A protein has these predicted regions:
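Metal-assisted phosphate- and nucleotidyl-transfer catalytic regions
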Residues: 4, 9-79, 102-115, 119-121
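Active-site pocket scaffolds in enzymes
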Residues: 87-88, 93-159
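Structured core elements
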Residues: 48, 73-77, 82-84, 128, ...
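Short loop/turn segments at secondary-structure transitions that flank enzyme active sites
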Residues: 55, 82, 153
Length: 159
């Protein structure tokens, strides 16, 4: 399966006529809309959403060097649901320190994390995939509990 990619600025806010929105974020109905749009226009059930505002992702997400207003972050949507999120991480000590301060975080609270930056980190990234979410969508289930061997919720903490 081939996926398509869309900058978040051009995503559902453009296609649903909400171009003037200041805050770029995806609601569940936006994710469904984007996946339907990708399927209709590109014949794929996967779509990558990129270029999130740099103020939204976590403090460790690297800003895009060409457009510092955006972060090097992505979400992968499949059949109307985010199944993966990831991006490039900051590996420069001073850049990490600046971003923490810009987000109102106290660097003292992250002393051991920052130590690794002082000694040199290679460029790196990461991602997280919701395997149970993916299985739920592949099997056409309505709830993630139906795709989990030992589902957890407010009333069930043990198998």
């Amino acid at each position: 399966l081939v996926g398509s990619e869309m900058c978040i600025r051009d995503s559902c806010y453009t296609y649903q006529g909400q171009q003037g929105k200041e805050q770029f974020d995806l609601e569940p109905e936006d994710e469904v809309f984007l996946c339907n749009w990708a399927k209709e226009n590109y014949g794929t059930e996967f779509i990558f959403v990129t270029n999130f505002p740099s103020s939204k992702p976590p403090f460790y997400a690297m800003n895009d060097k060409e457009d510092p207003r955006t972060a090097c972050k992505f979400d992968l949507l499949f059949r109307g649901l985010e199944i993966t999120t990831g991006g490039q991480r900051i590996h420069d000590y001073n850049e990490q320190l600046e971003k923490m301060k810009a987000q109102g975080l106290d660097p003292e609270d992250f002393k051991s994390y920052l130590e690794s930056h002082k000694y040199g980190l290679p460029p790196h990234g990461g991602l997280g995939i919701g395997l149970e979410r993916l299985v739920m969508k592949l099997l056409g289930q309505a709830n993630v509990r139906q795709a989990s061997m030992f589902p957890r919720d407010m009333n069930r903490l043990l198998p």
